[in-house]
Amino acid sequence: MTPLQNVQHFRSNAIKTERHRQGVKFLSFTRRYGTLVIFVLLVAAAAYISTDFLTLRNVMNLLRQASTTIIMAIGMLFVVLTRGIDLSIGSVLAVGGVIAALLAPEWGLPASIAVALVAGLICGLACGTLIAYLRLPPFVITLAMMTVARGSAFILTGGQPIMLNDAASGLSAFAGGYIGPVPYPVLLMAAIVLLGTFVLMFTSFGRLVKAIGSNEEAVRLSGIRTQRYIVAVYVISGFMAALAGVLITGRTGVGAPNVGVGFELQVIAAVVIGGASLMGGRGDALNTVLGALILAIIGNIMNLSNVPGYTQQVIMGAVIVAAVILQKIQNQKMS
Amino acid sequence: MTDFVQLIGIEKHFGGIAALKSVDFTVKSGEVHALIGENGAGKSTLMGVLSGNVIPTAGTISVEGCVRRFSTPGDAIAAGIAMIHQELVLAPDLTVAENIFMNRMPRLIDWAKLRRDAAQILDRLGFEIDPGATIGDLPLAQRQIVEIAKALSLNARLIIFDEPTAVLGPSDARRLLNLIRSLRSEGVAIVYISHRLDEVADIADRVTVLNDGSLIATRAAKDVTIEEMVRLMVGRPISALFGEKRTSPFGAEIFRVESLTAGPLVQDLSFGVRAGEIVGLGGLIGSGRTETARAIFGADKRESGRIFIDGSQVKIRDPRDAVKAGIGLVPEDRRGQGVVIDASIRINTTMTSLRRFSPAGIIKRTFERRFVGEKIAALKVKSAGIDAPVQSLSGGNQQKVVIGKWVDVASKVIILDEPTRGVDVGAKSEIYAIIRRLADEGRAVLLISSDHQELFGLCDRVLVMGRGRIRSELLPGEFDEERLLSASLAIEPIQTTVRTDQNPAG
């Protein structure tokens, strides 16, 4: 090489590295904010398709509908971070909902809600204990809990939906009420999301949950009783599901044993679209919220533009696949 | 003889790290070409390139004069190149015959024919192995023969042996070497990777030495002595790597294990380690060293045994108890057990001591960052910063992170299981210095290593394990590779009681 060529060679190399660096920056941006980008694009598309979309009323309505999904998705996120899965949440939701409706007339609202939430905790505790200490597969155990809890909801109600009576009017008021333009359940959801974000970002619990999902053995050999953390995430998930059940009972005025069938799949879809890895260790609360909102907005757009229900299901499935493929591509480029 | 395979100018980069730097390597038909070098020298990567497992960043491969491109192991096999892996890659639940013909089973299986064909190949090798036996039921030596049979049935014309005798007893090893000789006389080209230099001197026609990814030399085996091979491999006199041994007396016996039993590979072990002392656990792979470490640490269940720290018994049911008692373990499998590979240096370093940084469960980030920053500076971890994922570090630096997470927590005892496996020479000597410092600060250090130079260079005493028992104890004057191996292979216990009363000066 002549000196001149040498310099040119050096320059072109320098340019290449600079481009490479920018490429990496761009990719880490999309990895971090990829879900946000999709979300913003969707909002823009929705606003374009329907002038009703960006009205305060529609937005608040959308958020209220999504709030139960989001609450459960935060619980599911913790489970997924440990490389687990919780298929029981749709049924646990029903258990929570019917218990609140059943007990409210006699026990009063606070006690009945407390019992409903404790029931959710117990379902999670049962799953978590079996999974963590007997090393049974989460898929199978929570699948079993799904049918056990569903059956229990039917047994508790004798198969009939339980109407909320006047003693529980406070619950209906809460689930249907507003502070200014913001529905109460949306505020509750926001508080839970903030709490989830905080726990995952700033506490040792959150850090260890993620680390366990990446490499449980390394965490265990660091002197941490990993089983306790695994039990805890299922307890959280069960609690969130029961809470969602109470809210739904409040909103509909009925504790129905058949409510929430298939919700677990919707919630898992939200978590996955939010960028969490089902292989554990990766995911965060805010992106999970975006994942749930993306699903909700697509549903909302299709409703506003009169897409028939069955077609909606097909489109939803396609969206999930697209989201996962997108993430896969991003991850490959990253490594 | 002509070159069967020529590798020219092979380079391989993993991330920013060069694992191979412009390496040339040729193998002739009918020769045994030994490839030697320290762990991490690039032997496995080079053989990965030759067997299609690793795609080189640059360089050409030619087989019988034609340039080939191997993008999968299948391509290499099609070119007549087979590799006998260190961890044998046979399906344990299938039969010998099924394994041999694994990748070309007919759609409709004629079982009788399959077994006949398998028996024929095994006969050619001179081994009587039942083609209908299940692989999982065979001893390791026979499984290796099955691997070789599989390679031959694929018409392999070059076979790569990766540390084939590491897991074999002496008589099986001798039979294997004879088998390799007869393959050579049939015109098969053979690449032989081994740490046992006496075997290399015995069997090889040519020797190639790699160090730190570079080709150091290729010589005719008869022109090079074992001492010379060592010097070429290490690149400097061995003794310089390990630093000075302690000359001052040790402290009290702060760590003691009494009648530890856990499964077949940990049988009634008793020994002690004094403050400031580095005690080695030597022996063959499978002699129970790792199992002993895990049983002490509470990582695996144990049947019986007591553990004493500072003279008082501690109850260890799980790793958490061990950590509380001041014991740390640097596990054998770094990626699988030592680090959370995709988490940052910071997260890995404070994993053992997270409570210190999160009094109310909320992590004090500033405190944590300062701590980790100081730690990785002291351990000379080369990285892009404390938030870099451990994945981005070289093996040696990853290992420093694993040791780093124990420095403060393992205040009494630190157990290191193969701490320099897959680590380059530079990082090795740094890790040795760290281990010395851990001992000098008054800890009891238990070092497990299959690298005998390392055991002898670092340890004040070596306990030799064989089949789950302590077979012998070697003092510095008795540090001798042959002695260690023969003790580990002994069937009857030579010595089950262990001396602890002598002084290091003696």
Swiss-Prot record, chain B:
Keywords: ATP-binding, Cell inner membrane, Cell membrane, Membrane, Nucleotide-binding, Repeat, Sugar transport, Translocase, Transport
Residue numbers binding ATP: 37-44
UniProt KW Transport keyword: yes
Catalysed reactions, semicolon-separated: D-ribose(out) + ATP + H2O = D-ribose(in) + ADP + phosphate + H(+)
Positions in coiled-coil regions: none
Cellular component GO terms held in the UniProt record: plasma membrane
Enzymatic class: translocase
Residue ranges occupied by any ABC transporter domain in the UniProt entry: 5-237, 249-492
InterPro entries documented for this protein: AAA+_ATPase, ABC_carbohydrate_import_ATPase, ABC_transporter-like_ATP-bd, ABC_transporter-like_CS, P-loop_NTPase
Family annotation (CDD domains): ABC_Carb_Monos_I, ABC_Carb_Monos_II
Superkingdom of source: Bacteria
UniProt GO MF annotations: ABC-type D-ribose transporter activity; ATP binding; ATP hydrolysis activity
EC number: 7.5.2.7
Subcellular localization(s) per the UniProt record: Cell inner membrane
Gene3D superfamilies (alphabetical): P-loop containing nucleotide triphosphate hydrolases
Entry membrane topology: Peripheral membrane protein
Family: Belongs to the ABC transporter superfamily. Ribose importer (TC 3.A.1.2.1) family.
Functional note: Part of the ABC transporter complex RbsABC involved in ribose import. Responsible for energy coupling to the transport system.
Name the record gives this protein: Ribose import ATP-binding protein RbsA
Species per Swiss-Prot/TrEMBL record: Chelativorans sp. (strain BNC1)
